[in-house]
Structure formats: structure tokens, C-alpha cells
């Protein structure tokens, strides 16, 4: 089981900062970092789901994430100005949480892409799922370029 989280150039630094500076991020994401978030091959991978988090993730939130959903459609998430730290960290946290729920249900692999919607000034998460497979070499190369 694994979750691969990749990010656009505009979002990658929030993913990196969340893993590198856990004390600077909200408690919800800090809990995720403490339960198995690691860096591998240019992506961020969660190797095991957190039972506590699975129980706390409402079904309505899961239903909201169909293909492409922006964070401002979720009632529990306070929408902040684009580029503010809590807002972007929350996007990462919700992406990880959603991936955990899919893993628990399917025992497969989930890819989560975080991006910025310039027109709506909101974070966007796109999800795909399927059987586990290592990241494609082209994807890793692309991540290396945007993170450099």
C-alpha cells in the first residue's frame, strides 16, 4: 500500500516544508507526519494508514473529492488567501487523509496531484487510484526539475 503525492511547482515547497518542519504546520498534518510520511524518489509517500485519522475523515469529504475539487468547496476547511501557509498545508493534509481512506478501502495505490487554481485562487487536488506500482521514471524526473 502506498500514497504518492506530487505537486506542481507552485505547491511543491509546501509539501517539502510540511515534511521538513513539522512544528510549523497544523496539528492535523503533524499527526500525519508522525505516522509514516517519508520522502522517496522526489515524491512524498505515506506507507501506512493512520487508524485515528481514518475515523476522523467524514464520508462527505470523501464524496466531495471526485476527479478535481478545490478546497473552498469543503465546509470544514477555512478558505484563506492564496499563498498563506495554513491554507496550503491544509491542502496537503487533506490530500494525505483522502489517500489513506482510499488505501484502507482498496489496498491499492493512490496518486494525488496538488496544484494552484489561479483563476479561483484556490488549491486543487486531483486523484487517481489503481494497483500499486512504483513511480514512472518520467514522473520522478519531472519532480526533480520542479523541486530543484
Go through each PLM region and give its residues.
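Acidic, proline/glycine-rich low-complexity IDRs
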Residues: 90-148
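Long, charged/polar, surface-exposed segments that mediate recognition or autoinhibition
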Residues: 67-99
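N-terminal leader/targeting segments
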Residues: 1-74
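Generic serine detector
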Residues: 2, 8, 50, 70, ...
